[in-house]
Curated annotation (Swiss-Prot):
Organism whose genome encodes this protein: Desulforamulus reducens (strain ATCC BAA-1160 / DSM 100696 / MI-1)
ZnF region ranges: unnamed: 3-34
Record protein name field: Transcriptional repressor NrdR
Co-factor: note: Binds 1 zinc ion.
Gene this chain is encoded by: nrdR
Chain's role: Negatively regulates transcription of bacterial ribonucleotide reductase nrd genes and operons by binding to NrdR-boxes.
Length: 158
């Protein structure tokens, strides 16, 4: 590792510890030439995940875009930000777990829908109205009725 101060190519590791919730390793180093200390981070170099849109276009999976969608759906709802971030992380992990480099946008959308249903029903309906492109109030009502029926079925099963 090159020293950021003198560019000497050798340094020794003084301390290593997990960082970023175990997704990286923080290393404290000391330069073998100038003696100055610096910090480096080591993380897995993940291959980009590509989302295939309905029209065939491809774009790189954007975690920030997914998070923004969740934040918008959950706006003014009693859903903790940490829970939203954990859910987004879980969706990304699920998408990567299949080992495929490309995923269909519909698969991402369904994971989001299922996750929002668990998080908050109002956020679910908000997202569904955009994702499913409700054209009128009847489409909206149909989705709410499906949600209510699902809740009744769950109550009956208990």
């Amino acid at each position: 590792m090159l020293c950021p101060f003198c560019s000497f190519p050798e340094s020794r590791v003084l301390d290593s510890r997990p960082a970023d919730e175990g997704n990286s390793i923080r290393r404290r180093r000391e330069c073998g030439e100038c003696g100055k200390r610096f910090t480096t981070y080591e993380r897995v170099d993940e291959r980009p995940l590509v989302v295939v849109k309905k029209d065939g276009r491809r774009e790189v999976f954007d975690r920030a875009k997914l998070l923004a969608g969740f934040m918008k759906a959950c706006e003014k709802r009693p859903v903790p930000v940490q829970r939203i971030e954990d859910t987004v992380h879980s969706i990304e992990r699920e998408l990567r777990s299949h080992g495929e480099l490309e995923v269909l946008s519909q698969a991402v959308g369904e994971l989001v829908m299922n996750s929002l249903l668990e998080l908050d029903e109002v956020a679910y309906i908000r997202f569904a109205s955009v994702y499913r492109q409700f054209g009128d109030i009847y489409s909206f009502l149909h989705e709410v009725e499906k949600l209510l029926k699902s809740k009744e079925d769950k109550k009956g099963a208990l």
